[in-house]
Regions:
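Extended, non-catalytic substrate-recognition/exosite surfaces adjacent to catalytic cores, especially
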Residues: 27, 110, 159-161, 165-254
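Peptidoglycan glycan-strand catalytic modules in the bacterial/periplasmic cell-wall system
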Residues: 3-194
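Short, conserved beta-strand segments within well-ordered enzyme catalytic domains
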Residues: 2-3, 248
Length: 254
């Protein structure tokens, strides 16, 4: 339960919306978009991509904002599905990163196929509000099943994995469009689509793709709620949608 600055309840977070899909149900354009954006060598490495890891680390040390992330898709699955969501920094963060590498290489990839790992990734990932997984996200943001997504919609959805609330198409269409441009560029770069397909998908207005707000049942303070949820996850490693909590905020509803 979330309370405002006057200790009045303004939101009650129920169980997250989640409907799982199998790898075979995922459209090829969505799988391609996720792989191109999140882990282009996913099907080649064993859970740890050394060149990418050290390139990202050196880039971050040098202060390069475009250095990219060091985590493979498998490492992200370990973090979101098999360990707590708390974000560590400093030495604790370094230790946590190597724990993720160990679990990804010697546990996850030894037991599950690449296709199963993708299933974990798309079904368990937070995608804004109280939505988890691509099926619920597709229905909420585009009004259709994930199996029906076109290239433009798939690129938008794949782009949300980096920062769901920042790139939510229903509330931040311009951010979503900018992120879609990046995803489509990466898809072309890695040979998944042609330049013509990239241009056509980029030309579609995001607003014309999204479901109407009437279908979304949006809390008027949803943006603030999303921020609070992320802060609680980062600081305490718990999910307010699944863990009973009383959260007191500074929200002034007036």
């Amino acid at each position: 339960i979330l309370y405002d600055k006057d200790d009045k309840q303004f939101a009650k977070l129920g169980s997250e919306k989640r409907e799982k899909v199998t790898y075979d149900q995922l459209p090829e354009v969505l799988v391609d978009a996720i792989i191109a954006t999140e882990d282009s060598r996913f099907f080649q490495h064993n859970g740890f991509d050394a060149p990418r890891f050290f390139k990202a680390v050196l880039g971050q040390i040098a202060g390069n904002p475009d250095a990219g992330g060091a985590s493979t898709l498998s490492m992200q699955v370990v973090k979101t599905s098999f360990t707590d969501a708390k974000v560590d920094s400093g030495m604790a963060g370094i230790i946590r990163k190597f724990e993720d590498i160990y679990l990804a290489v010697f546990k996850l990839e030894k037991v599950y196929t690449k296709e199963q790992i993708i299933e974990f990734y798309v079904n368990n990932h937070f995608l804004g509000g109280n939505i988890y997984g691509v099926e619920e996200a597709s229905r909420a943001y585009f009004g259709k099943s994930v199996t029906e997504l076109n290239l433009s919609e798939a690129a938008i959805l794949a782009g949300m994995f980096k920062s769901p609330n920042a790139y939510k198409p229903t509330t931040n269409p311009q951010n979503a469009a900018n992120r879609r441009t990046t995803v489509l560029y990466l898809m072309r770069k890695h040979g998944y689509i042609t330049k013509e397909e990239e241009a056509i998908a980029n030309a579609i207005p995001v607003e014309s793709l999204t479901a109407t707000s009437a279908n979304l049942n949006v809390n008027p303070y949803q943006g603030y709620i999303d921020t609070v949820v992320n802060e609680v996850k980062d600081k305490y490693g718990v999910n307010p949608y699944t863990t009973p909590l009383l959260v007191y905020t500074n929200l002034d509803i007036n």
